[in-house]
């Protein structure tokens, strides 16, 4: 008995089913690839290829000599939260350092505090109240604040004091450093940050602390102009991405001893 040929309606229905199955498999494959890529990207965060290859994971902050005053350490977390609400500070993360509302209790040298006062800075801003203790403690952080909120001081002051401490322990020589790198999106911002650090470093030296040398790495600035800094070792490098890459390729600057990284803006 001859078999009846499927109708056009049935053929269309079968075709739609096959296309639906094909699309489902394709979507599943795309989703699987997306998850693999996301997992790989997450794993690469703040880690180099050598660290990933050796499965090195960092679970502890860099040890620093700075400690908050005893009365700050003895505050309860509830008291810390009350202070954060008072100054409109929002914090996320595990066991954040306590907020400190003045530079003196942060143990900032008097000479630096006096220098800040000459610049019209009498007290820390909200991001500095939380961000400075965080950086002083050796913790990683992402700081968000409005323009003019004091972000530059939040990342530059801890690096300056860490550098002075390192120089006082073992004086830097030619080829040493930097121990801190600040990457800025523009030459103008990099120069402003560099000038701010340089002024604070001079006030710190006048106060009897070790000399801290900063290097400005931007287009238009010849390295021959800063050769004296390179000869004595560099504590802090302030750079734009393009110039930094060029100096790394030419081995003018090495990052083997860099333990402090800031990506500005």
Give the predicted meaning of each segment.
Residues 129-141, 152-173, 196-201, 245:
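Walker A/P-loop NTP-binding motif
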Residues 93-144, 154, 161:
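Conserved pre-motif I regulatory segment
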Residues 263:
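Conserved P-loop NTPase nucleotide-binding/switch module
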Residues 111, 171-249, 257-260:
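Conserved nucleic-acid-binding Ia/Ib motif block in the N-terminal RecA-like helicase ATPase lobe
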Residues 145-149:
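The conserved Walker
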Residues 118, 129, 156-157, 194-196, ...:
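Short coil/turn segments at secondary-structure boundaries
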Residues 108, 113, 117, 121-122, ...:
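Short amphipathic alpha-helices and their capping/turn residues within compact interaction modules
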Residues 1-105:
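Intrinsically disordered, low-complexity accessory regions that flank the conserved helicase/ATPase core
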């Amino acid at each position: 008995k001859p078999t009846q040929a499927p109708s056009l309606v049935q053929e269309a229905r079968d075709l739609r089913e096959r296309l639906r199955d094909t699309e489902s498999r394709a979507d599943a494959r795309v989703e699987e690839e997306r998850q693999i890529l996301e997992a790989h990207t997450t794993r690469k965060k703040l880690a180099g290829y050598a660290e990933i290859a050796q499965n090195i994971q960092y679970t502890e902050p860099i040890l620093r000599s700075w400690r908050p005053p005893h009365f700050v350490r003895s505050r309860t977390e509830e008291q810390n939260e009350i202070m954060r609400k008072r100054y409109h500070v929002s914090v996320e993360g595990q066991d954040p350092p306590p907020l400190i509302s003045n530079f003196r209790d942060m143990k900032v040298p008097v000479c630096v505090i006096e220098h800040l006062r000459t610049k019209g800075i009498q007290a820390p801003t909200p991001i500095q109240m939380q961000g400075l203790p965080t950086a002083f403690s050796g913790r990683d952080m992402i700081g968000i604040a409005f323009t003019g909120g004091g972000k530059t001081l939040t990342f530059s002051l801890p690096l300056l004091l860490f550098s002075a401490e390192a120089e006082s322990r073992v004086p830097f020589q030619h080829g040493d450093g930097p121990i801190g790198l600040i990457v800025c999106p523009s030459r103008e911002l990099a120069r402003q940050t560099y000038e701010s650090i340089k002024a604070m470093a001079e006030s710190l030296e006048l106060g009897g602390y070790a000399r801290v040398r900063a290097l400005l790495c931007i287009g238009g600035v010849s390295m021959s102009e800063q050769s004296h800094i390179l000869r004595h070792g560099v504590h802090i490098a302030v750079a734009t991405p393009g110039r930094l890459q060029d100096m790394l390729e030419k081995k003018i600057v090495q990052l083997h001893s860099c333990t402090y990284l800031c990506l500005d803006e």
